[in-house]
Amino acid sequence: MLGMSHNRLQSQGTEHDKFATQKLFAIWGQIQSYLFQVELLKRCDPTVGVRMINRLKLNVLMIYYLEKKMVPALKEQREMNLTPLTYGLWLALRRAKLEGELLLDALCEFKDGGNLRDFFRKSMSMCGDCPYHSTVELDTYGGKVSTEIKFLHDVENVLKQLNYCHLILKADTVENFMVSLDNYLLKTLGSGSVVPPELYDPSQPCSVCFEELCVTANSGDSTHKRIVRKICDHITKQINIRVNSDDMVTHLPHATYVPDDKRTTAQTALDVIQSTMRDTTTENDSNISVSKAAAAALDAHNVFLPASGDLYAISELQFWIASSGRKLHQPRGNTVESFADNLEALVSKERLFDLRTSIVETAVFDRRMDHFERVFAQEIEHMNAADRLLLGGRAAAPDDIIEALIKACYDHHMSAPLLKRLLYPDEAAHDALKTVLERVSSHCIGNDIQCQDGDGTCGERMNETGHFRTNDSFAMSTTSLGHDEWLEMVKSASSDVARRRKMYAERLTKKSLASLDKCITEQRHELEKMLRVNVYGEVLIDSYTALFNGFRSRKRLLEAVKNCCANIIDNRNSDDAFDAHRFMQTSLLKHRIDPAMLPSLTHKFFQLVNGPMFSHDRHRFAQPSNTALYFSVENVGLLPHLKEEMARFMFHSSRKTDWTVSKFRGFYDFSTIDNVTAAHRMAWKYIKELIFATALFSSVFKCGELHICRADSLQINSNGDYVWKNGIYITYETEYPLIMILGSESSTSETQNMTAIIDTDVFSLLYSILQYMAPVTADQVRVEQITNSHAPI
């Protein structure tokens, strides 16, 4: 019965957590919707927003209420264990408060002053310096470093660098640094779901990009070679937007809130535009005009009139065009014609959309709205082509622009006459037909003679019988070989030349098209990432919360020890610590590390050096510690010689006694270090000393294995309390680098009987552990050592 009751309570707790999570997601979604509506109101005619001031005030008050209700709990959660959900909600809540107040103030000022440009400048923060440029500084154990943040990827890079340098950073310093990053994320991640194009650089890969390349087929290429071509879609994620410029025409008849007379007027105006477009749309294709001219020339001829050479050429070209089986404007079955219209067509579509919108606004609202893009139309017109593409449009989806750009590339490539003749022989026939018609027209105009009057004078190369005239030199040369033999030779040579030319052209065409396809395939991913609408991904929030919790756990561990442990031994102020240090150091240095233990000790070293951001060794399907460290060092671009040094660090001096580097109470002391790389090496040496000393302690004194853990490795239960486990916890703090927890197995939530030892010296800490585990043995061994040291020689 007790087991069933416990399971029922546990199930109820799980259901309660799920319900609370769902409510938080619902609130976050509503705040995101509110932020999106605020962004729309910023860009709309402020006269419309003025009519919504009362509703906007209610929303601002609701944000105040949510802030008062939720922020205390969110701050408490932040101190316990920050989650991506609570942090994202906290960002959105703070940003919604700022944006709502800003829009309300701008609308109130517009209501009093009525300046459109001032409203847009204030509501959209168009004045002043760029808010997305920030310089941040950080104090490490090896000195001060600074970096500039311009993109979201810069924030991710800084977080990866913090993760790698976590063992040479003080928690208080990082906490202030994380506040600076939080302010930057508040301006970006907190502003809504849509990312401004100037905020991301997709050519910079993120940690997820690198991890994806590590688990996918490499085709013989190295990871670093492939990552250069990687387009990041994790910091920001692109989405497909459906844009239909006819939505207004389709939905207007169903707009019941519009008066019937105004709706009828608007529909009538739209119908007039549609009919006018059908009447004025003409076929401007050059192929159609050429075909009409050719048909007129051929229809003017009859069997009673002699056919000139040019007329015969026109007839033959018409024959080949008709026999090709493809009608004009028939879709071609290749990649090129599967794309959308060209850029000019997109511009025309945008202008048509603006015309329709203006007519409907005038009919329904009796005025044309002064939206942002209309008030600043002159500035938008002066933008260059690249900025206009990034700006996008209201009538064309980003994919339409992308396909138009790609089609323009193909059209430019295929405008070469050679490619046109090979790919589209019927179009080559059209070009030839156009050339013949131009020659006939110019010749007839120059001689002031009608081409089809029957006198046979239009063809210079036609004789009186209507046949081709033979060149005299050609006739003389045929006398030696014979007419038929010479013609056969000319025909064979011409055929051979044509065949060779065609084979060469086909080979050239295949290579050029293959190169173009490869180039466009590679560039298409970048175009899609740049021009499509992007929303914020979860990478930054996940990375920020992981690092924040990792550094916060150091201070929280010390606070929890002071509150929960019944017995605290602080060796930092003990008078007997020096004797204990000398005794334990001398006892351990008599022994050597077993080489068979080095692989496991090396993995422990990797686990302690790795930061909190990459937790592959703590997943449900855990990987070795070197895998997590591999992602940590590769994502910061650690130099190869340092990676090699780190990989072999535990094997150096394993048979000697020079692995001890710290002085008495000098563990994790960096007072003599003046650069970051030297600080890293010193931290590695301290960690190596801790691992070797602990391993020798376990083997010499037979007290069982001592577990060495990071401060962020302790789990937290649903009440926010630590689930304590015995072990030595390294905090990477110079004031209290080592904390030993003992007796956790006998402690409960009601009674805390644990013992905690705080120290800045490895050997005095180990002696205190020996005293706790085997006090009689510790005193006996120490007395024997003192006696032997004072015995006469």
From Swiss-Prot:
Transmembrane segment boundaries: none
| ZnF (C3H1-type) intervals | 206-234
Q: What is its main location?
A: host cell
Which molecular function terms from Gene Ontology are attached?
Answer: ATP binding; zinc ion binding
Q: What biological-process GO terms show up in the record?
A: viral DNA genome packaging
Ordered alphabetically, the record's keywords are: ATP-binding, Host nucleus, Late protein, Metal-binding, Nucleotide-binding, Viral genome packaging, Viral release from host cell, Zinc, Zinc-finger
Mention any one GO cellular component term assigned to this protein in its UniProt record: host cell nucleus
Q: Where is the protein localized?
A: Host nucleus
The UniProt record gives the binding positions of ATP as: 697-704
Quote the function comment for this protein: Component of the molecular motor that translocates viral genomic DNA in empty capsid during DNA packaging. Forms a tripartite terminase complex together with TRM2 and TRM3 in the host cytoplasm. Once the complex reaches the host nucleus, it interacts with the capsid portal vertex. This portal forms a ring in which genomic DNA is translocated into the capsid. TRM1 carries an endonuclease activity that plays an important role for the cleavage of concatemeric viral DNA into unit length genomes.
> What is stated as this protein's family in its record?
Belongs to the herpesviridae TRM1 protein family.
Subunit record text: Associates with TRM2 and TRM3 to form the tripartite terminase complex. Interacts with portal protein.
Q: How is this protein named in the record? A: Tripartite terminase subunit 1
Q: Organism, per UniProt?
A: Gallid herpesvirus 2 (strain Chicken/Md5/ATCC VR-987)
Query: Taxonomic lineage of this organism?
Result: Viruses, Duplodnaviria, Heunggongvirae, Peploviricota, Herviviricetes
